[in-house]
């Protein structure tokens, strides 16, 4: 079903190694990198494993959607995918469960964990 397609897409996104300057890249650059297109004449090399993620990142970067279009139902669906994939849990680093993300600001945060 559609759920499986999204699940596979999200899994690939989460396992993709990122360039060292990922946090300094804007959304356009991130999408270019993830889409495999070259920008600035050279392709950035992915070397860093993603250790945290927020739903907005998955929505905008993995699915290529606009942030203002994220509905609560979409959030639940994406959170459901993270649960199904396993290996990700809500952060306990902050009381609110939110941390700051470049581009997106404070967002509910999921961190990688080894079972």
Task: Indicate residue ranges for each PLM-predicted region.
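Short, small-residue-biased leader/transition segments that mark boundaries at the very start
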Residues: 2-6
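Positively charged, polyanion-binding regions of nucleic-acid-associated proteins
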Residues: 7-52
């Amino acid at each position: 079903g559609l759920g499986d397609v999204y699940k596979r897409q999200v899994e690939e996104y989460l396992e993709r190694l990122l360039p060292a300057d990922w946090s300094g890249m804007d959304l356009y650059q991130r999408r270019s990198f993830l889409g495999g297109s070259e920008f600035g004449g050279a392709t950035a090399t992915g070397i860093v494993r993603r250790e945290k993620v927020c739903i907005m990142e998955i929505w905008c970067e993995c699915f290529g959607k606009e942030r203002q279009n994220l509905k609560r139902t979409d959030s639940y669906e994406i959170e459901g995918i993270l649960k199904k994939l396993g290996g990700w849990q809500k952060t306990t680093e902050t009381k609110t469960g939110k941390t700051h993300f470049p581009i997106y600001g404070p967002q509910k945060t999921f961190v990688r964990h080894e079972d």
